[in-house]
Amino acid sequence: MKTRSTSYSPPMAGLAILLALALLAAGCTQPAADGHAQTLKITGSTTVLPVAQAAADAFMKDHLNANIQVTGGGSSVGVQAVGEGIAEIGMSSRDLKPEERAKYRDLVDVAIANDGIAIIVHPSNRVPSLTMAQIKEIYAGNTTNWKDVGGPDMTIVVVGRDSASGTREFFSESVMKKQDFTPTQLEKNSNGAVKQTIAQTPGAIGYVGLGYIDADIRPVPINVNNALVEPTIANVVAKTYPIARPLIMITNGAPEGLAKTYLDYLLSPAGQAIVAEEGFVPITA
């Protein structure tokens, strides 16, 4: 799988959302260099970003008049940017919230891939597996040493995502069952930043999308009824991996023009091949 880039995680997620939207809006007035290119702005989830960027690169090779700009910022940024007309397509690694649908009544979402959320640790940590209950207790701050879950005698450093993250929202619902995260959690603004922290911190635990797994970190199998289930594409397809979710694209109303052509490409066999190449699960699998 490909190595993902990392980025700094600011302490104030709300400020980060506003800044991301301001920067995106500032780019809306820039004319195309040749006067003919069509610009498509896509923003949001850092989980979906690698797929969207790779698809955009391939798409633009065959559509020379297309200028597709893909940026991250988190799922909440993607939803808000589309709802307020700052971007044509939003990326999200979670379902739309009821309050978002109420605020932006014309939002339309389409699943473009499936994904699993891998629990990751430093490569030196050989904890054999974790149950869903153990993961919840760690992230709630009730389990603080790896020896209590079959690992080394070492303090657990909890690493998660900031409040703009769709991955965090899904993790909160599917793993935490809405229980509060420990206040000592280190909050990062991207999958890449989580991965980098885990790779540099022997006692750390984190969670990332399947496409971010590489040799720098170690994915931990999840113990499901005494069966150890690895975070793999095959197990997501088989529906045996317990932390899985769809990845979606969002438009304000039914997609039209370049946005529709791009989304049609992403859902085509060529686009779904890119989904697989980036380490995610094709929607048709």
What function would you assign to each model-found segment?
Residues 1-34:
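Secretory targeting signatures
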Residues 28-285:
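Exported/periplasmic ABC-transporter solute-binding proteins
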